Every structure is written in C-alpha cells, then in structure tokens.
Amino acid sequence: TAVIGRGLEADGYRVSVLAQPDWHSAEAFSAFGRPRLGVLIGAGNLDSMVAHYTAAKKRRSEDFYSPGKRAGLRPDRATIVYANRAREAFGADMPIIIGGLEASLRRFAHYDYWEDKVRRSILFDSGADMLVYGMGEYAEREIARRLKKKIPVSEMRDIAGTAYLTAEPDKCAFPAVELPSVAQVRDNKRLYAEATRTEYAEHDPIRGR
C-alpha cells in the first residue's frame, strides 16, 4: 500500500489511505470524501482468513499485522467486505480496483479450506471492476493515468498484471488460455488440478498467456 501510494504521489496524485476501516457500515469509507478517480482496495500483507484462523480452524487471539497485534480489526474475507462497502458508499459509477495478496491468490476459481469448497473468482463476490495481481506498481499507475483521462475501466483491457470479468473473451488484448469453468472444477478434481497447473505454468511474465 505504501509503495503504490508513494508511486501515485510521485505522479502527482493525492492519495488517502484508510487503514483497517470499520466495515460494519459504509460511513467510515467516506471519511476522506468522494474519491476523484477511484478506490484501490487491499486486504493487508496476509490473506485475512489465514490471519484470523489456525489450520485447525480455531480463531486466532492475535493479528500480527494489526497495531498491538490486536485481533478483530479486519473482517473475514476483507477484500470482499471492503469492496462491497466502498460500492455502497460511492455507488455503481465509482471505479473499484482490488489487489494485494488476498485478491491475487483468489483471482481464479480456488479451493477454500475454511468452507471446504471451490469458490469462484473473488471478482464476482467483491463486485470490483478490476483486479491487479502481483506487485502492481506499474499496473496501478497506468490505471490512474487512464482514469485521469476519463477512460472507463471497462475499456482497460491491455494492462499487464490485471484481471477482469468479461462476456467477450475473444476480445482479450493478449494471447489467452481457456481454463475449465467453475462448475467443471467443482465437480472434477482432476480438472481442478489441471487448471491449477496451467495457472502456474502461465505465470511467467515473458511467455505466460
């Protein structure tokens, strides 16, 4: 968050950081007023479910990524909760971009240990317009540059390191590999394993698709 924020500041943008806001209502998300360009959301340095629960699914008493190791300052599935509260606060026309470790690892259909099921991409449940995965410095600055030019997120389809939902996969700006559907990987463990293998094989930033 700090690195990306400083990068945006270096480009001349004003950045407000709302750390661990009260997620019980949308009011806290309006603390700095309405953003001019958009809202960037991250869940922290660790997946919120890993931070909150042990491998035995017991609630942790401490959160090492919160002030004073105090637990309970972030919600479960923080990216989804924060994105939905931001949408509630600012409306359907506000660009909402999610990123960070939690979003990056959940951008595809994925097995969720705590629910013991395969969940769909976090883009669906968060309602975000776009997901930035990996380190994100270049992508976030490029997104901000285009938003400043009034280019809608729906037209940003050629920024490396981003993911989005579309009903027109044939219009992808890059060579693509089609993975099995969520329904298929939920019902077939072999297809799930093959999809995961393909995802990892295509991570290479030079030759990956």
Kindly give the residue locations of the regions a language model identified.
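Glycine-rich beta-alpha loop elements in corrinoid/cobalamin-binding modules
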Residues: 19-209
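Short helix-loop-beta junction
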Residues: 3-15
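Short amphipathic alpha-helical face segments that pack within enzyme cores
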Residues: 2-3, 81
